[in-house]
Amino acid sequence: MSKQSLSYKDAGVDINAGNTLVERIKSDVKRTTRPEVIGGLGGFGALCALPSKYKDPILVSGTDGVGTKLRLAIDLKKHDTIGVDLVAMCVNDLVVQGAEPLFFLDYYATGKLDVDVAADVIKGIADGCVQAGCALVGGETAEMPGMYHTGDYDLAGFCVGVVEKSEIIDGSNVKAGDALLALASSGPHSNGYSLIRKVIEVSGIDPTTAQLAEHSFAEQVLAPTKIYVKPVLQLIKHTDVHAICHLTGGGFWENIPRVLPSSVKAVINEKSWEWHPIFKWLQEQGNIDRYEMYRTFNCGVGMIIALPQEDVETALALLQQVGEKAWVIGKIEHANADEEKVVIC
């Protein structure tokens, strides 16, 4: 009795679809390149030289995902900006230490490869890399039958940057009297989405048709995470930045203490900046208390920067010049060991 000859495609893995995707994304990858990148797509490893301007370079690396914002993007069939989120979550963590992002790699996993969806996602990743000034040097597209529900996929990002050793920003220079400058967020960025999805569920709204503050709810809830690399690197160049905090999971209470010495605390005036409308909606619809809002969401603030009072005017003018909305939201004060590191009043 003759047996049917099985192929990898019969098992659910379409190598031709993967090759088609590679061809589709080549032009997007090409527009992210940097002079330091050696070679192109297709190698077993990606090669990148260190920029020659660094005398004592230190590499800084990071990896992240986009959490359950991805679930919402899949459900709402909006795949073109989730890649920006992926890049943002990685590069914003790097620039906090003063690092210039050099290159980025992605991991895209799915049960059955949809070339159109994957190409949209990777185009978004390339868009994010262009915004951050880093090269998309490689990635992995994993088609894994039986591992994901139909239409689902998962993402992870990996980034490497470089900073001059003498210019690493680690918060050690923060002192009482420093001002706290906040850079506006575009919305929830990529944190708190399990709670956001729960609030959407209990509110009973249809996110595909609902409006919020005269804009599409779907557009606002899926607004891509802001990439702060270029404006923050300019701030570092022209002012004496003492610390930078990327407001991600854990919000104000958990992220700000990560960049403060033990002898100080951050005192923040919550009336000093604007909450994005989506945060007001979430708080009202979910009956979320104040502490939980500040622990889960950025509440309109994507980055907080500690710098001397005398540099505030220069910093605000520079940020305005490049189109960034910013506010002075507080200051650094002396603290005892047993005091809270963050006070919001």
Curated annotation (Swiss-Prot):
Pathway: Purine metabolism; IMP biosynthesis via de novo pathway; 5-amino-1-(5-phospho-D-ribosyl)imidazole from N(2)-formyl-N(1)-(5-phospho-D-ribosyl)glycinamide: step 2/2
Pfam families noted in UniProt: AIRS, AIRS_C
One Gene Ontology molecular-function label: phosphoribosylformylglycinamidine cyclo-ligase activity
GO biological process terms held by the UniProt record: 'de novo' IMP biosynthetic process; adenine biosynthetic process
GO CC annotation, single: cytosol
SUPFAM superfamilies xref list: PurM C-terminal domain-like (SSF56042), PurM N-terminal domain-like (SSF55326)
Listed Gene3D superfamilies: PurM-like C-terminal domain, PurM-like, N-terminal domain
EC nos: 6.3.3.1
InterPro entries: PurM-like_C_dom (IPR010918), PurM-like_C_sf (IPR036676), PurM-like_N (IPR016188), PurM-like_N_sf (IPR036921), PurM_cligase (IPR004733)
Subcellular location: Cytoplasm
Protein keywords: ATP-binding, Cytoplasm, Ligase, Nucleotide-binding, Purine biosynthesis
Keyword Cytoplasm carried by entry: yes
UniProt xrefs under CDD domains: PurM
Catalyzed reactions: 2-formamido-N(1)-(5-O-phospho-beta-D-ribosyl)acetamidine + ATP = 5-amino-1-(5-phospho-beta-D-ribosyl)imidazole + ADP + phosphate + H(+)
PANTHER family, sorted: TRIFUNCTIONAL PURINE BIOSYNTHETIC PROTEIN ADENOSINE-3, TRIFUNCTIONAL PURINE BIOSYNTHETIC PROTEIN ADENOSINE-3-RELATED
Family named by the database record: Belongs to the AIR synthase family.
Protein's UniProt name: Phosphoribosylformylglycinamidine cyclo-ligase
